């Protein structure tokens, strides 16, 4: 069935001129992305005209739309089909579902600071139990370069400095800084105070981090410490066995116990007899944490998490003397001794264990393949729209031999007297073309999709035509068929041949004996024609198609 097309109405008026300008700009943009040969500097498209000869359109079939026409983008659907309430609801539900899945698959606790190891906490603002487990942190920690420590060895600043000076006034050496000396004296006092109040020597942090000596120059302590005769085994190991400077990752403040500074040596602490008056009273910042079951063993209850924290960031040398490690050190488990900072957060060890053992439940390759298959299926469901009974597609045979015009210029580079010496513009005018192809026009809701079929698909869609010929006069190099003189020349076309002939005229300089003065003009013509054919096939031939909103 033939269809009469009012060509003047389609291509005339302001709308027709705007459409012609859009086609001109489109072809010009495509030429700018084409790699040019060495003898062509640039190509510019100046004008496009539809001409006055309309194409012949014949309706061949009405079928269901091609599956590719149902592939849509959610964003474009939301922007272009705002009038369809049903589609809007489907799009909104799908988007909310995908956002929920993204949050769930992101991993619970992935951005939760409580899931981080204690030695990787984010300081006073993001540390474990920063304000809940241990009370308010010192505000000076925020501006400190050591995140969690504003003054090494002194929790809460220097408010308790008078306490350390009163107890260890004679033990400071001039070769060390006051802060380092205070840190060492404070740690010695903490160990003596804890041991003097009935704590056994099985506390892991006391054996892992024995009291270092920062007092004298010769390595011997000059500070008066209770039970001085029992402190001699602390110095069994030579000071040169293992030393390291305190680093940012190994210095931490415990909100309940005060601090656990790093030790330069691995020392062992012998058991001290319980004494109610064996040491000075602790400062307010070192108040004993409350334990509901056994108040005399609260430090042993919280000591192992600190040991686990330090052990993960420190490299400790073996003791030179005989080992004096208590048997309870290796038997203590984090599940029996939770970190005091984990009161308001899940246990770090349990979380890490679950993460490390969960992938072992299934094969990594099987899990990856399954996830990939699910993603592909989800992507397919997201893109394909639901088919409806009112969706339709029309198949046309379109034949054209008209006076369509395309004006462009190409700059030819002259290689004399040197390479690329000067560029000369060549004016190329496409004055007509011969076309025979099969087009597809599909309407799905408020969208119209259009494309041409390749020669093989065209024959399969409409079959062999009566006016098709297998040969004819024309340019055998290009394969274009030359129509007979006059008329539209449709009798010499081939079904699905698409662009079968392009007529072009070139102008450059002066002509001598009917020949061009430059031999590269023919190369420019062939290059331009090849690019025009390539642009048409890449942009208009299926599976490429154009979509129009109606």
UniProtKB/Swiss-Prot annotation:
Residues 327-344 have a biased composition (Basic and acidic residues). It comes from the Eukaryota. Residues 288-305 have a biased composition (Basic residues). Residues 356-371 have a biased composition (Low complexity). Residues 1-550 form the SMP-LTD domain. GO terms for biological process: mitochondrial genome maintenance; mitochondrion-endoplasmic reticulum membrane tethering; phospholipid transport; protein insertion into mitochondrial outer membrane. It is a peripheral membrane protein. GO terms for cellular component: endoplasmic reticulum membrane; ERMES complex. It is found in: Mitochondrion outer membrane; Endoplasmic reticulum membrane. Residues 83-92 have a biased composition (Acidic residues). Residues 346-355 have a biased composition (Polar residues). InterPro entries: Mdm12, SMP_LBD. Residues 76-97, 196-386, 466-489 are annotated as: Disordered. Component of the ERMES/MDM complex, which serves as a molecular tether to connect the endoplasmic reticulum (ER) and mitochondria. Components of this complex are involved in the control of mitochondrial shape and protein biogenesis, and function in nonvesicular lipid trafficking between the ER and mitochondria. MDM12 is required for the interaction of the ER-resident membrane protein MMM1 and the outer mitochondrial membrane-resident beta-barrel protein MDM10. The SMP-LTD domain is a barrel-like domain that can bind various types of glycerophospholipids in its interior and mediate their transfer between two adjacent bilayers. This is Mitochondrial distribution and morphology protein 12. The gene is MDM12.
């Amino acid at each position: 069935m033939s269809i009469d097309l009012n060509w003047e109405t389609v291509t005339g008026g302001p709308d027709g001129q705007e459409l012609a300008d859009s086609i001109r700009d489109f072809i010009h943009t495509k030429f700018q992305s084409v790699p040019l040969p060495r003898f062509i500097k640039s190509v510019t498209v100046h004008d496009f005209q539809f001409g006055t000869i309309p194409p012949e359109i014949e309706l061949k079939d009405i079928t269901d739309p091609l599956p590719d026409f149902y592939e849509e983008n959610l964003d474009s659907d939301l922007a272009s089909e705002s009038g369809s309430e049903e589609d809007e609801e489907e799009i909104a539900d799908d988007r909310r579902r995908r956002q929920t899945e993204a949050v769930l698959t992101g991993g619970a606790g992935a951005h939760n600071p409580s899931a981080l190891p204690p030695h990787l906490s984010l300081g006073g603002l993001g540390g474990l139990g920063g304000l809940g487990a241990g009370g308010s942190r010192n505000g000076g920690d925020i501006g400190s370069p050591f995140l969690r420590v504003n003054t090494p060895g002194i929790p809460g600043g220097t408010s308790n400095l008078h306490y350390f000076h009163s107890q260890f006034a004679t033990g400071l050496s001039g070769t060390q800084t006051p802060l380092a000396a205070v840190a060492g004296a404070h740690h010695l006092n903490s160990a003596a105070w804890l041991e003097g109040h009935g704590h056994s020597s099985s506390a892991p942090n006391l054996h892992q981090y024995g009291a270092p000596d920062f007092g004298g120059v010769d390595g011997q302590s000059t500070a008066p410490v209770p039970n001085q005769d029992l402190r001699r085994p602390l110095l069994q190991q030579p000071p040169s066995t293992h030393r390291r400077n305190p680093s940012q990752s190994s210095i931490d403040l415990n909100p309940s116990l005060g601090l656990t500074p790093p030790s330069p040596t691995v020392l062992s602490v012998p058991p001290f007899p319980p004494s109610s008056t064996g040491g000075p009273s602790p400062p307010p910042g070192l108040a004993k944490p409350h334990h509901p079951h056994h108040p005399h063993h609260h430090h042993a209850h919280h000591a192992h998490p600190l040991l686990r924290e330090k052990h993960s960031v420190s490299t400790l040398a073996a003791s030179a003397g005989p080992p004096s490690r208590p048997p309870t050190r290796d038997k203590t488990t984090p599940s029996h001794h939770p970190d005091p900072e984990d009161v308001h957060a899940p246990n770090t060890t349990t979380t890490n264990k679950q993460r490390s053992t969960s992938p072992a439940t299934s094969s990594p390759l099987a899990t990856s393949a399954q996830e990939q298959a699910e993603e592909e299926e989800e992507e397919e469901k997201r893109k394909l729209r639901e088919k409806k009974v009112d969706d339709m597609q029309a198949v046309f045979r379109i034949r054209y031999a008209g006076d369509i015009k395309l004006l462009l210029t190409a700059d030819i580079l002259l290689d004399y007297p040197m390479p690329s010496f000067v560029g000369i513009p060549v004016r190329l005018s496409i004055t007509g073309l011969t076309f025979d192809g099969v087009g597809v026009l599909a309407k799905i809701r408020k969208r119209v999709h259009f494309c041409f079929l390749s020669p093989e698909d065209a024959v399969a869609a409409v079959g062999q035509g009566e006016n098709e010929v297998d040969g004819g006069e024309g340019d055998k190099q290009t394969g274009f068929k030359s129509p007979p003189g006059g008329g539209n020349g449709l009798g010499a076309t081939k079904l699905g041949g698409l662009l079968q002939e392009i007529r072009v005229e070139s102008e450059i300089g002066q002509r001598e004996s009917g020949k061009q003065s430059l031999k590269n003009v023919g190369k420019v013509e062939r290059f331009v024609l090849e690019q025009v054919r390539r642009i048409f096939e890449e942009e208009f031939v299926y599976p490429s198609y154009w979509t129009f909103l109606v």
